């Protein structure tokens, strides 16, 4: 019997990407995986439901894939992910073309449900699980470049920021067992992965629930023992949860890149309190100063939300002043999105969209100049570059200061053919606002 072909459309964040890879891994034994949705008998849309624009993209994608049932080979349309977890009861009536719905903790059942559906059990067609006890784990089919892989170390969140719906969708914070993470990382290394990117809603809380204390520093130490792994990168570190042993491990561990993604979200105490953040401006600046003192070459990335309810012009300008003083290396800016069922959505003082957009643009322009000034200092320096692409003329890669997709890239030429997924020494000869231009200094990294 010919195997059904399965296609996946994965939307949203890198945590969603890991879910998609686990789903594909689970499907690969019984089904053929295809990257061409037009060839797929089964199409899975893994949705995002975090902010309004993501919800709309998810709905548009589901409707687009529903057309494939009429125009191409698709016989079965499955919708999964955060949008389904959040609005599944409504969507099963609004979009009847969806044959199967799965909540964010149901992925371990997907092969069984598909088999039952194909065999005629339509009772399995609308399955939602609102339990927050499960953690999706299993063999993955990577959808990233072969040299880098995200590895989720925990699921859920206990922070309950007033603007965020994630705890209601993903449930309470739950760490994975360390031995399971090590096993997965070892398997990824055997596939040629050189860079592990640790993710969770709050990576700094890793271990606090199952080991009785924060254990991210221990996990980093154990991961660094895996042969073949050269870089270990940590994203989503809440500033108030960064602790001394973690700082020390990052400082001394050669495989842990000196880079931290720390979602500050705001710097005004007034807005931080409204956001339900468990920190203050002084705590944040003290933590940045401590990190820079302990790890002199550390790269700090952060994100800000502008246009939060009751954010004054003075609150906004406080972010600008903070960035001018502390000159963070990487900054992302988001306009506040009013999400139903969150405390912030019910607050007085909602900000006009035009003001949000103006503040977003002003903040990004300010950071653009800061980034350019920082990048100027990199000219004539040499870096180990992880090669990711070649377009026939230029190679593209990243140094340790750059996370995939969210930061810049290094572009360079080489007189010799280089292997994608390998490291090469590159001298920077020119900077741009976010990217760097270089030349190969030595075809082997020392």
UniProtKB/Swiss-Prot annotation:
Keyword Transmembrane helix: no
Binding site residues for [4Fe-4S] cluster 2: 157, 161, 164
Cofactor binding mode and count: Binds 2 [4Fe-4S] clusters. One cluster is coordinated with 3 cysteines and an exchangeable S-adenosyl-L-methionine.
CDD domains reported for this sequence: Radical_SAM
Alphabetical GO biological process terms: tRNA modification
Cofactor: [4Fe-4S] cluster
One cellular component (GO) term of this entry: cytosol
Domain TRAM as annotated: residue spans: 376-442
Swiss-Prot/TrEMBL keywords: 4Fe-4S, Cytoplasm, Iron, Iron-sulfur, Metal-binding, S-adenosyl-L-methionine, Transferase
Amino acids binding [4Fe-4S] cluster 1: 13, 48, 82
Molecular function via GO: 4 iron, 4 sulfur cluster binding; aspartic acid methylthiotransferase activity; metal ion binding; protein methylthiotransferase activity
Family matches, as InterPro entries: Elp3/MiaA/NifB-like_rSAM, Methylthiotransferase, Methylthiotransferase_CS, Methylthiotransferase_N, Methylthiotransferase_N_sf, NA-bd_OB-fold, Ribosomal_uS12_MeSTrfase_RimO, rSAM
Domain of life: Bacteria
EC number: 2.8.4.4
Family: Belongs to the methylthiotransferase family. RimO subfamily.
UniProt-listed HAMAP family: MTTase_RimO
Protein name listed in UniProt: Ribosomal protein uS12 methylthiotransferase RimO
Organism: Clostridium botulinum (strain Eklund 17B / Type B)
């Amino acid at each position: 019997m010919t195997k059904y072909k399965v296609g996946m459309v994965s939307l949203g964040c890198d945590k969603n990407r890991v879910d998609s890879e686990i789903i594909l891994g689970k499907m690969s034994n019984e089904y053929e995986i295809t990257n061409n949705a037009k060839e797929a008998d089964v199409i899975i849309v893994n949705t995002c439901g975090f902010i309004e624009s993501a919800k709309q993209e998810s709905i548009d994608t589901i409707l687009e894939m529903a057309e494939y049932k009429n125009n191409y080979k698709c016989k079965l349309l499955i919708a999964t992910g955060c949008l389904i977890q959040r609005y599944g009861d409504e969507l099963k009536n609004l979009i009847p073309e969806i044959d199967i719905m799965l909540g964010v903790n149901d992925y371990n059942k997907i092969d069984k449900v598909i088999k039952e559906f194909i065999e005629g059990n339509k009772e399995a067609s609308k399955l939602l699980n609102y339990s927050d006890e499960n953690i999706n784990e299993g063999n993955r089919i990577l959808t990233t470049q072969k040299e880098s892989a995200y590895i989720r170390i925990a699921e859920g969140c206990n922070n309950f920021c007033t603007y965020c719906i994630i705890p209601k969708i993903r449930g309470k914070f739950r760490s994975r067992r360390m031995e399971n993470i090590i096993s997965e990382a070892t398997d990824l290394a055997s596939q040629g992965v050189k860079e592990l990117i640790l993710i969770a809603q709050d990576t700094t809380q890793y271990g606090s629930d199952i080991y009785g204390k924060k254990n991210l520093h221990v996990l980093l130490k154990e991961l660094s023992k895996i042969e073949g792994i050269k870089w270990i990168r940590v994203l989503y570190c809440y500033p108030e949860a960064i602790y001394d042993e973690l700082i020390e491990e990052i400082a001394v561990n050669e495989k842990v890149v000196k880079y931290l993604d720390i979602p500050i979200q705001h710097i005004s105490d007034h807005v931080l309190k409204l956001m339900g953040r468990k920190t203050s401006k002084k705590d944040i600046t003290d933590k940045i100063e401590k990190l820079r003192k302990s790890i002199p070459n550390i790269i700090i990335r952060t994100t800000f939300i502008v246009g939060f309810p009751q954010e004054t012009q003075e609150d906004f300008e406080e972010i600008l002043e903070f960035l001018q003083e502390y000159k963070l290396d990487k900054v992302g800016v988001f306009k506040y999105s009013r999400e139903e069922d969150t405390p912030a959505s019910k607050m007085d003082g909602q900000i006009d969209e035009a003001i949000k957009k103006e503040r977003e643009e002003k903040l990004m322009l300010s950071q653009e100049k800061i980034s350019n000034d920082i990048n100027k200092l990199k000219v004539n320096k040499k870096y180990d570059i992880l090669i990711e692409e070649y377009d026939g003329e230029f190679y593209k890669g990243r140094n340790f200061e750059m996370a995939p997709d969210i930061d810049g890239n290094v572009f360079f030429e080489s007189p010799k053919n280089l292997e994608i997924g390998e490291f090469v020494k590159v001298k920077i000869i020119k900077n741009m606002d976010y990217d760097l231009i270089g030349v190969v200094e030595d075809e082997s990294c020392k």
